[in-house]
Amino acid sequence: MNLKTGLATALVAAVVAALVTAATIVLVWRLAPGVVKVSSLDEKRVVGIVHDYLAKNPEILVEMTTELDKRTAAEQAEKQQKIVGDNAEAIFRSPLAHVAGNPNGDVSVVEFFDYNCGFCRRALPDVVKLVQDDGKVRLVLKELPIFGEESEAAAKAALAAAKQGKYFEMHQKLFTEPGKADKDKALRVAGELGLDVAQLEKDMQDPEIQKSLDEAKELAQKLGLQGTPLYLIGDRVIPGAPDDLYDQLTKKVAEVREKGCKATC
């Protein structure tokens, strides 16, 4: 997930404003400490000095932007932790979601995903490896079809496959088989897995399946999720699919085991 252009622009503007203010204070102190007031300074001259200084030292702007990014991320993580705690039952133990790995595991890893999300597809091997390597992880899968009707059809097919005991197999093949995930692909994959395709197509219309999608969407909105994938490990959050996703997942699983989590997870 990337910051929206508007947010990035706002951050840069905030950095510049902060630098101008800081530079003004420094100049006042250097010019006449305790005597010269900020209001008596030549504003244009100060702005010009700051502009010239930034032009010669652009790395300062980068450093300030990086620091703002860190603070914003920390604030967002803190807010998300509270939201996770307030919605722990629906996030970790909803009967509408499906669980892979150990259903009685001691740590829950929740993934929000879309079958047409390239980053979700890239993350799949790390998620599968986590479940295979750690027999105590409980993987809660939240279908969040944000890429339109084709994604929604694929999600419904996967949820319908659960009625025939093949949810996780269907889940993996929808990611690994080439081509866009849509209804046609889902039905073909279902046939390859030996499912009753006619029954699956009928089960896709089950109101409980739509309820599952609606619940995941509502939770994503509460969490402020702007894209997929998103991982919750207890009340720890991993947005997107970083290159070291497996390492981050195992680290946070270990943290939850050692320290617990604020949410009832």
Which role fits each region the language model picked out?
Residues 39, 43, 47, 54, ...:
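Solvent-exposed, acidic/flexible segments
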Residues 58, 124, 217:
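Short amphipathic alpha-helical/adjacent loop interface patches that line ligand
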Residues 52, 58-59, 97-98, 142-145, ...:
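Flexible, active-site-adjacent loop/turn segments at secondary-structure boundaries
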Residues 39-92:
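Extracytoplasmic c-type cytochrome modules immediately beyond a signal peptide or single-pass transmembrane anchor
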Residues 102-103, 150, 230:
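Short, flexible turn/loop "capping" segments at secondary-structure junctions
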Residues 2-47, 51, 71, 188-265:
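C-terminal cap of thioredoxin/glutaredoxin-like
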Residues 89-107, 131-132:
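A short beta-strand-turn-helix
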Residues 110, 115-116, 121-196, 201, ...:
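Structural alpha/beta surface segment adjacent to cysteine/selenocysteine redox centers
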